[in-house]
Structures are given as C-alpha cells and as structure tokens.
Amino acid sequence: MSASGKEKPLKDVPGSYGVPVVGALKDRLDFYWFQGEVEFYKSRMEKNQSTVFRVNFPPGPPGFPEGHGIVLLDQVSYSVLLDNAKVDKRDTLIGSYMPDLAFTGGYRTLPYLDTAEEKHTTYKSLMFEILHESAQRFGPELSSAFDRTAQEWEAKIAKDGSVESLSTAGNMVIQFLYKTITHQDPMATMGDDPHSVYMAWTGVQFAGIAYTNLPHITEELLMHSFQLPFFPIKKKYEQIVEFFRSAGSGLLDLAVTKYGLDREEALHNLVFSFGINTRLGLLKMFPPILFFIARAGAEFQARLKQEIRGRMKKREDAASIQALGDLKLVKATVLEVFRLMPSIFVAFGRARQDLEVESHDARYKIKKGELLGTHQYFVMRDPVVFKDPHSFVPDRFMGSEGAALLPHIVWSNGRETDSPTPTNKQCPGKNQAELIAVQFIAEMFLRYDSWEVTQESSVSATKLDVHLCKLVKRS
C-alpha cells in the first residue's frame, strides 16, 4: 500500500543527465537502438529504485534541443500532468522540441497550446462543436468504410494467406473520419491511397521520434540526429490542405463567423487536429483490438459474439449509439486494450512553479520550468493498481470492482471518469473514440464468427505488426 501525504519521505529526484551532449547521445542510442524504450525506462527505474527519476528525453542534442527532464512512471506521480494549475503544456506535445512550423502552415496548432492561452479554449470549443454536429454520422460512415476494408482483407487473405492490418485500416479511418466531418470522400481528390499521403507528412514531421524499418545506423543518422526539412513533403501537405480548404469550407465558415478565428490559421489547425491527433489515434487502436481478441481464443470470442448478436438483431444496429451502449463486455474489452496499448504512450509538460510530486512511496521537489514526462506503458501497468498488469483481462473493468479502476485509465490524457472540456487537455474525441472501437468490434462479429492472426503478429509500444490470416464468415 502507498504511504499517504506528509508521511512519505521527501527525496531528491534520483538519476543523472551525464556529461553534456555525450549523456544525451548515450541515452538516445539506448532508447532507440540498444535497449528500446520500454527497457530504457525499466532499467533506469530499477537502477534508481524509483518510478520518478531524471533522464534525457530523446531525441536531444546535437540536432534537437536539450531533453533534460524528469520521468513519472506510476499512477500517483503521473497525476501531476493532469493538473493544469501545476503544469504548462505549451509546446511540449512530444517533449523538449516541436517540429518546424512549416509542417503546419506556419501556425502553432491546438495540441501545442497551453490551457492558459485563449486560443486553446477557442479551438477546442470549435472541435467540440464539429464532433457534436457529426456525432450521428460516425456510425453509418464507419459501417460503410468497414465493409470496403473487410472485402479488401478477404481478397488479400485469399490471394496471399494474410493481410497486414495497420496500413489497410489507414484508408478506412481517413474515409469514415473525413466523410463524417466534411460530407466528402477524400479519395475523390487525393487518390486511392490517401493514407500514404498522410503518413509521408506525419513521418517526416515527426522523424526525430519515429521508428522505421531502416537499419539502426541509417535511422540514427538520417532521422534522430537532425530535424528533416519540410520541402520533400510540401506537395503532399498541400494536397491535404486543399482537401480541407474545399471540403471543409463550412467548418472554416463556422470558425470565422462564430469563433472569430483567422480562416487560414483555422484551416491548418483542423488539418493537424484531424490529420494527426484524430486520425492516428483511431488508426492505432484497430490492430491491438484485432490482436488481443484473436489471442484471447475461441471461448472469449464466443462471449463477445453472443453479447453483440443478442443485442443487435440487424446489421444496421451496429451504427446505433443506443445499441452500442448496451455492449458492456465489449466496452470493458476496449478499455483493457486501451490500457495495454494506448494510441499515444507519452505526455509532457513543464512545472509552472516549484512544487512537490508524490509517487506511491515518496515525495520529490520539482523546480519551476523543469520538463516532466511520462510513458503510459508503465502508468497503466502500475502493479500497485492493477493485478496481473501485463495480462489482457477483458472483463477487468466489469462490475463494481472494475468501476473502481476506471479513474486509472488515462489513455485520453485524462481520467476515464473525467470529461474533456475546452479548458483541459483531455482528448476532445474521447467518447467518440471509445464508441468507434466498440462499433468496430461489433462490425467484426456481425460479419465474422471468429478471426485469427499470424503467430508472428505482435504489438508493442513501438510497433503494431498484426497480420490477419483467417476470417471465418458468419454462419
């Protein structure tokens, strides 16, 4: 059990940044190459005998700003990052650096704004209105896009024996997301593979923290040492922008007339919010869902199938918000997948003033301006909170005991029991994302009796390598 309040000893934050530049370089090589990010934090947590310690957040010098910071790897210490009064999120989306503004049209976009900035409240209010106005269309558009993707999966498995799920789900996400919010199909203007256009823009923009299939030395020299320039993907970004400029003209009118925003700035904000945050968040949740349900076996799949088909008498029910809300086991399964594999593993902020941060068993003094970060692999597998923290337990969040654990689910940059507002940093689409995940599982079991993934399939904090190899059509 954790000690409480002032009973906890006050300690200096352990750990060291090492020799300038050299220490940062060593940590970066360990993080990306020699250890990998989970072992990187785990080994230092064991060395320091603490879930709170100093570390060089990558990528760091020489090509990126110094990444000196303090990592918070348990449920108690992490909570300070949810306190807007204590932590400033200005320009800390991915740590100590942010990509060149050329990647976002020259504007700081919503995820880089702190809650104390007036535009944060304005832009997030705009996002809420767009999501609210689109709410009834998400279900039907997902059903339509899922049908096309399922047909693609079936054809690919028949031809090649398996199909990779992440990239094939990419166009499904873009189609149903943008048809929902703009009423127009991006494939009509961006071609048959808009996913590749978005991934090029995303990949170059965030190359400093990205993983690829390149040899380690090539990846290190090409991507993690210096920020890549904007010009190689300029035309692809212009494709994305022009789609939103045309298809999203009504959204831009709303931004200008109701919220008093500059039209061009609003354009690039919507491109980023829907093209990075929303698109990637949705995309990254589908492969883990397929993986964990497949690996859970036939008996568990039968339980899900029974719940879904018992409440959904016809295919159209999969798009019904009311029907989806009745799927308690499916919702618990979604939360367990999100616990193990959140779409975003990291979060950062800077201390607004000198403060104390508590862990389960100690208190630590933090100075104003220090960079604080976390990795949710550890936070949502905190053994003090979760029994068998590394195991997939799909009914973990069922019943009264499960409900008591809900505040510890923080995939949305906020607690499951909290709601996003214009004045906090919690994902504005939290509720929609969970509903979409529930619908996706329902769509799968309304079309298939079961499915399997290849033995080589795996999911981790850095890679979603899930290949479907068997789809058993509904009998």
Curated annotation (Swiss-Prot):
Disulphide connectivity of cysteines: none
Keywords: Fatty acid biosynthesis, Fatty acid metabolism, Heme, Iron, Lipid biosynthesis, Lipid metabolism, Lyase, Metal-binding, Oxylipin biosynthesis
Broad enzyme group: lyase
Catalytic reaction list: (13S)-hydroperoxy-(9Z,11E)-octadecadienoate = etheroleate + H2O; (13S)-hydroperoxy-(9Z,11E,15Z)-octadecatrienoate = etherolenate + H2O
Entry EC number(s): 4.2.1.183
Record-level Gene Ontology MF annotations: heme binding; hydro-lyase activity; iron ion binding; monooxygenase activity; oxidoreductase activity, acting on paired donors, with incorporation or reduction of molecular oxygen
Keyword Protease: no
UniProt binding sites for heme: C427
PANTHER family for this protein: ALLENE OXIDE SYNTHASE, CHLOROPLASTIC (PTHR24286:SF255), CYTOCHROME P450 26 (PTHR24286)
Task of the protein: Divinyl ether synthase involved in oxylipin biosynthesis. Catalyzes the conversion of (13S)-hydroperoxy-(9Z,11E)-octadecadienoate (13-HPOD) to etheroleate and (13S)-hydroperoxy-(9Z,11E,15Z)-octadecatrienoate (13-HPOT) to etherolenate. Has no activity with the corresponding 9-hydroperoxides (9-HPOD and 9-HPOT).
Family: Belongs to the cytochrome P450 family.
Protein name: Divinyl ether synthase CYP74M1
